[in-house]
């Protein structure tokens, strides 16, 4: 493996990222990310791979509700109604990332990596993968109170799998 800025990531996660980037390059699919609880870790992981500039279009780190609204076009009313950690918000984040980029495929992550707030459980994470043709996949995971780092690494595996599924159609 080449030297990366994420030495704490397990080798299998880095290997999955390399495989995904090769698949995206082969299919000429450009990717955008919209991350909340992972704080840009997916974008960092993808851009650690040599040649990522050919397929990684951009990444949004929208940790706050305000950022989700300002950068991705979500409405505060939807966040208030559904909760920032919900299927609806994850799907809207993915759609907003596509709308605000030139990418073909978006992956959004929103969840509780550490202790949950008043409206959720530790380790609850929602993922959405949206394609330009309108196809969207959602995945809800209940990872439990594993701690921020462990939850974020688990999120990388799930996100890479969803991106692969999105590329393959």
Language model features by range: what are they?
Residues 1-169:
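Short alpha-helical segments enriched in small residues
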């Amino acid at each position: 493996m080449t030297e990366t800025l994420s030495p704490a990531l397990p080798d299998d996660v880095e290997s999955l990222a390399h495989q995904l980037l090769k698949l995206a390059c082969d299919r000429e699919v450009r990717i955008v990310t919209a991350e909340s609880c992972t704080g840009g870790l997916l974008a960092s992981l993808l851009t650690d791979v040599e040649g990522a500039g050919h397929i990684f279009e951009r990444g949004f780190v929208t940790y706050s509700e305000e950022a989700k609204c300002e950068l991705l076009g979500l409405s505060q009313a939807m966040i208030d109604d559904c909760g920032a950690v919900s299927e609806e918000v994850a799907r809207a984040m993915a759609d907003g990332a596509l709308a605000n980029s030139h990418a073909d495929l978006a992956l959004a992550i929103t969840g509780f990596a550490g202790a949950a707030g008043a409206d959720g459980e530790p380790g609850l994470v929602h993922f959405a993968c949206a394609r330009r043709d309108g196809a969207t996949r959602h995945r809800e995971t209940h990872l439990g109170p594993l701690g921020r780092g462990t939850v974020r690494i688990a999120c990388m595996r799930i996100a890479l799998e969803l991106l692969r599924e999105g590329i393959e159609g």
